């Protein structure tokens, strides 16, 4: 149920960038929607939490969503970069998904999630 990870960069201890390939065969695309499949927002949040709790904030878990904005759909076959930034002092995880269009990146979604122990 997770995407194929192409590359991972962690330029700082509290920040990670993960390049993902959205395989059209992913479970999340089935039935969402028949005419044009797209990656549901719940999957995007699930993946952000998956990587955050393993790479940046082990021992922390989901508390609530402070804000989230879905700006453009993520389609099957897309290459995207998931950027996660962890601010432990504020217990806040910031995430963004950027869709790759050649050398250009377009923000598809972003948000802030509050974590707790």
Please give the residue ranges for each predicted region.
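A generic structural signal for short beta-strands and their flanking turns/coil linkers
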Residues: 14-18, 29, 61-66, 78-80, ...
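Aromatic side chains
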Residues: 29, 33, 70, 95-97
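Acidic, aromatic-enriched beta-alpha/helix-loop junctions
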Residues: 34-46, 50, 54-55
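HotDog/MaoC-like acyl-thioester-processing domains
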Residues: 4, 11-15, 85-117
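Hydrophobic beta-strand-centered segment that forms part of the acyl-chain substrate-binding groove
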Residues: 49-83, 88
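Catalytic strand-loop segment that frames the active site of acyl-thioester-processing enzymes
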Residues: 1-39
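Hydrophobic residues in beta-strands and at strand termini
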Residues: 20-22, 70, 115
